[in-house]
Curated annotation (Swiss-Prot):
Pathway: Porphyrin-containing compound metabolism; protoheme biosynthesis; protoheme from protoporphyrin-IX: step 1/1. Pfam families: Ferrochelatase. Keywords: Cytoplasm, Heme biosynthesis, Iron, Lyase, Metal-binding, Porphyrin biosynthesis. CDD domains: Ferrochelatase_C, Ferrochelatase_N. Catalyzes the ferrous insertion into protoporphyrin IX. It is an enzyme of class 4 (lyase). This is Ferrochelatase. One of its GO terms (cellular component) is cytoplasm. GO terms for biological process: heme biosynthetic process. InterPro entries: Ferrochelatase, Ferrochelatase_AS, Ferrochelatase_C, Ferrochelatase_N. Its EC number is 4.98.1.1. It is found in: Cytoplasm. It catalyses: heme b + 2 H(+) = protoporphyrin IX + Fe(2+).
Amino acid sequence: MTIANRILPHAPADHPPVPVPRVGVLLANLGTPDATDYWSMRRYLNEFLSDRRVIDYPIWKWQPLLQLIILSKRPFTSGNNYRSIWNEERDESPLMTITRDQVRKLRAAVETRYGAGNVVVDFCMRYGNPSTRDVLDDMLAQGCERILFLPLYPQYAGATSATANDQFFRALMQVKRQPAARTVPEYFARPSYIEALASSVERVYATLDTRPDVLVASYHGMPKRYHREGDPYHCQCQKTSRLLRERLGWGPDSIDTTFQSVFGTEEWLRPYTVEHVVQLAEAGKKNIAVISPAFSADCIETLEEINGEIREAFEHAGGESFTYVPCLNDDDLHIAALLEVVEENLAGWID
């Protein structure tokens, strides 16, 4: 990291270096374990499942169950799942690899838009590394006096966008000199985001010999109770699917909206993806495609769960062709959509 410093003509000779003032753009995603061994997985899962935004059961009830039972077994199974998709060359999860690529491309686009050295673009993870606090400290050291915080979740949910913001605010509470700060709201309805989604579907469909009978839009699930308590996530997922269908020019029954990654015994948003694809196969729809509009980058939930477990369930039920449409990742249209979000939210700070 190279830091350019200002020369202060009226400062005493022993005055510490003062960085050139900059604007920061800090992207945030969910997180990833550092490795696939038991203790790395346990640390990661403990941080994730101890988040009150994710699991809001009473602490006295949840923590004994988590520490004594869940974290004694789940790190083994989760570690095996991560090993099946691990980027061995870089020794990191695909989410980490893809997020680095996204930031590299967005950084170049921001530099083209605002000039070299004026805006610092970096990323953090809500759970695991790089932590929000560590990256915030690094950005402050580079002279960022204003920071735009961008959770990479197109749809808002308390368990994703809000907890990322919480962690950013907690990090701000721990620094002596706070920068000006803004957070970016959900962006699921932006035409540029919908265009990127639609284009990804069209590219994949163009490679297929036979058009799938249906496109399943699988979103990460959450307890139905959270929806009843006011979380807008379910509504935003439904609208995302509708906007995607309208942009593609498809009929009303061409996209099914489902929810995955159910955890625990509580009722979650339905229909469940794994059950729905089985029902499709049993109903004679043997050729399907699946897309994950809520994930900005491919990760354990898409590469292992959708393209592994859910694919297997579909094929076991008699399905013949299962096409997975990758996440937007570092696709140029996705980066352009993110740049548009950044430009809009930096207005008044830098032009």
